[in-house]
C-alpha cells in the first residue's frame, strides 16, 4: 500500500512504539527498509520492562502523535499499531491483559473525535487474536482448562478467532458501509483503503469490502 499510495502522490503518516514499529513500516512496505516518497514515520520508544508491569505500554504517546499528525492537515492517510493486546496477551496475565485493552479503548476515545473534526474515517482491525482468549480451553468439555491446583491454565499464544473490521464513519451520512462476507481477510484491506481514498486498487489486490450506498 505504501508504494501504491506514494505513486499516487499521497502523504502518509505511520506511527507505533518500538515493539510494533516494523509492522507499520518495514513489513507494511513489503519488507523494504526505506521510506517511499511522501511517508513520515514516527517511532515511540517502548518501555524496557515486562509488559504485564506496564500494560498501557505507549498507547497514549502513539495517540498524541496521531492527533498531532491529524490536526496538521499534512497527511491523506495515517496508520498506527497499538501493541497492547498482543504483547500483554502473551504474558498470560489476565488482569494486565484487561488493562491493556482498556488502555487502547481510552486512546481510541481520544483519536476518533479528532478524525471526526478533520472530516476523516477510520478502519480498525487486527491480524490475529490474543487477549480475546486468556485461558486454555479443554477440548473435551469446552470449559477453561485448569491446572492441578485448580487455577486456570493461562493461554499465551495467538488465537485463531476471526478478527473484526470496523469502519468508523461520521462524515458520509450513512453512505459508507462494509460488505458482509465470511470470506474476507487481510488481503482485502489494501483495496478497501484505496477505495476510501478514491484510488483504483492494484491489479494484484483482492477486492474492496467498501459498500457505497
What feature does the model see in each segment?
Residues 1-213:
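Feature captures the catalytic ectodomains and active-site-proximal regions of enzymes
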Amino acid at each position: 500500500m505504501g508504494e501504491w499510495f506514494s505513486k499516487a502522490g499521497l502523504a502518509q503518516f505511520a506511527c507505533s512504539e518500538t515493539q510494533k514499529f516494523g509492522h507499520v513500516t518495514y513489513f507494511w512496505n513489503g519488507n523494504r527498509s526505506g521510506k517511499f516518497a511522501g511517508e513520515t514515520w514516527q517511532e515511540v520508544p517502548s518501555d524496557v520492562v515486562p509488559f504485564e508491569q506496564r500494560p498501557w505500554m505507549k498507547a497514549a504517546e502513539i495517540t498524541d502523535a496521531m492527533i498531532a499528525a491529524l490536526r496538521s492537515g499534512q497527511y491523506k492517510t495515517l496508520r498506527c499499531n497499538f501493541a497492547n493486546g498482543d504483547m500483554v496477551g502473551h504474558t498470560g496475565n489476565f488482569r494486565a491483559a484487561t488493562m491493556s485493552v482498556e488502555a487502547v479503548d481510552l486512546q481510541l476515545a481520544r483519536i476518533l473525535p479528532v478524525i471526526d473534526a478533520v472530516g476523516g474515517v477510520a478502519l480498525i482491525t487486527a491480524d490475529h487474536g490474543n487477549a480475546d482468549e486468556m485461558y486454555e480451553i479443554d477440548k473435551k468439555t469446552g470449559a477453561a482448562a485448569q491446572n492441578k491446583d485448580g487455577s486456570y491454565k493461562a493461554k499465551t499464544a495467538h488465537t485463531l478467532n476471526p478478527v473484526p473490521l470496523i469502519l468508523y464513519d461520521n462524515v458520509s451520512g450513512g453512505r459508507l458501509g462494509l460488505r458482509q462476507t465470511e470470506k474476507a481477510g487481510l488481503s482485502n484491506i489494501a483495496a478497501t483503503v484505496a477505495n476510501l481514498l478514491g484510488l483504483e486498487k492494484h491489479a494484484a489486490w483482492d477486492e474492496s469490502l467498501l459498500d457505497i450506498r
